[in-house]
């Protein structure tokens, strides 16, 4: 019986392995989106898993940009029927919790720990830029964590500078590839926005008791 090869060389084999991985990421994202919509997963777990899938997707789609220039066509070719995943990965590029963040009311008992979390996330984000950690897959998770912690704090209004600035940066980064890096100008601007938002955040804290 003659052996049938699925690929002709190592490069072709890697391509098909990448296809399989892309297929798996899209399917996993669709499953995650449905679980979130049906309240089968809590928002923080959803956000963490969704961020990982988005970063993996960005890295893989950058690798496959020549062989898979159109992700929707790839999904159609393999009859995937994953509209929620395609929206999340291709159109939005942000977890639903970041895109449609509902202000989470924090009780007095846990507001102090949330404030500490916000401060830590601000400092970590600013320090990472000073250490020249400027790749999208390095910056995006830090800003996403910061955005999430700010949205937990009920004393901050929806239009608080830090919230709007982080949302703008997350949206901008989501349109870039995972391996892309911020330019020196972008890095300086982001650091400035973080510092400005941090100062506004600290100024807002005394209002917590009002």
From Swiss-Prot:
The lineage of its organism: Eukaryota, Viridiplantae, Streptophyta, Embryophyta, Tracheophyta. Component of the ESCRT-I complex (endosomal sorting complex required for transport I), a regulator of vesicular trafficking process. Required for the sorting of endocytic ubiquitinated cargos into multivesicular bodies (MVBs). Mediates the association to the ESCRT-0 complex. It comes from the Eukaryota. GO terms for biological process: endosome transport via multivesicular body sorting pathway; protein transport. This is Vacuolar protein sorting-associated protein 28 homolog 2. Belongs to the VPS28 family. One of its GO terms (cellular component) is ESCRT I complex. Component of the endosomal sorting required for transport complex I (ESCRT-I), composed of ELC, VPS28 and VPS37. Interacts with ELC. InterPro entries: ESCRT_assembly_dom, Vps28, VPS28_C, VPS28_C_sf, VPS28_N, VPS28_N_sf. Keywords: Endosome, Protein transport, Transport. Pfam families: VPS28. Residues 109-205 form the VPS28 C-terminal domain. Disulfide bonds: none annotated. Residues 1-99 form the VPS28 N-terminal domain. It is found in: Endosome. PANTHER family: VACUOLAR PROTEIN SORTING 28, ISOFORM 2 VPS28, VACUOLAR PROTEIN SORTING-ASSOCIATED PROTEIN 28 HOMOLOG.
């Amino acid at each position: 019986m003659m052996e049938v090869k699925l690929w002709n060389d190592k490069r072709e084999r890697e391509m098909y392995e990448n296809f399989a991985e892309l297929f798996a990421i899209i399917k996993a994202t669709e499953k995650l989106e449905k679980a979130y919509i049906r309240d089968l997963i809590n928002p923080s777990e959803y956000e963490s898993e969704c961020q990982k899938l988005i970063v993996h997707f960005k890295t893989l789609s950058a690798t496959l940009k020549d062989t898979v220039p159109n992700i929707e066509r790839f999904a159609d070719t393999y009859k995937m029927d994953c509209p929620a995943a395609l929206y999340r990965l291709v159109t939005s590029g942000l977890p639903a919790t970041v895109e449609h963040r509902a202000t989470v009311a924090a009780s007095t008992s846990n507001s102090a720990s949330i404030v500490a979390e916000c401060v830590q996330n601000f400092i970590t984000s600013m320090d990472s830029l000073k250490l020249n950690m400027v790749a999208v897959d390095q910056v995006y998770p830090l800003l996403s964590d910061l955005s999430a912690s700010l949205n937990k704090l009920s004393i901050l209004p929806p239009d608080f500078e830090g919230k709007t600035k982080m949302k703008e940066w997350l949206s901008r980064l989501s349109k870039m590839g995972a391996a892309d890096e911020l330019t020196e100008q972008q890095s300086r601007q982001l650091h400035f926005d973080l510092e400005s938002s941090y100062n506004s955040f600290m100024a807002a804290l005394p209002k917590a008791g009002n």
